[in-house]
Amino acid sequence: MIRAHESPHSPHMPEGGIRTLVLVEGPSDAAAVRALATRLGLEMGLDTTLHHIQISSAGGITNFSQVLAGFARAHPSARLCGLYDTAVGGERHVRRALTAAATRIAAHQSPESAGFFACVADLEDELIRALGAQAVERVLEEQGELPSFRRFQAMPEHRGSPVHRQLHRFLGTRATRKIRCAKLLVERLDLAKLPRPFAGLANHLVKASGVG
């Protein structure tokens, strides 16, 4: 089973049942990783565990230390992995969080060596670049959101910006849209051409689950 959108300290977590924690910054990231896991063939569910993987949103990079430390105390033998944004000192926060969880990495090593993969801007940016603007617009059209996007593009503050940037800003204007579209964009990815951080995490999850 893969669980999403729960705290690592959730009272509903089966004792000793989680072997891998995937920690991300926000709920849209969790939705994207959950969609990736489904595409990788990892069994999903709410009440039973198969692959013993939990996907959790920390509610921001500054909460990584608290979440990882608490999870490591409750599950000392579990694996830790995740995604983070490079903005706002992302790598520094991840290194501090790994230290709090007693997972030390050498100064010359990147967080990737501990299973944490960096998105250059954020995950939505990575997904838009991987799919291309036309594919993302098709997703918006299927959701009935394309007219809203066209109006957004016509606003003076957005007019003339690259379409990629317009799409990124539009997805972020509503939290529900951002979460919904994150899942839909992942469902359209070519698994052989995943964005670099997603490819690294996918490889980590497959190894952790024993699938493949």
Which residues make up each language-model segment?
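Short acidic, S/G/P-rich loop/turn micro-motifs used as interaction or catalytic elements
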Residues: A87-E91
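Exposed alpha-helical structural elements
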Residues: A32, N63, D122, E126, ...
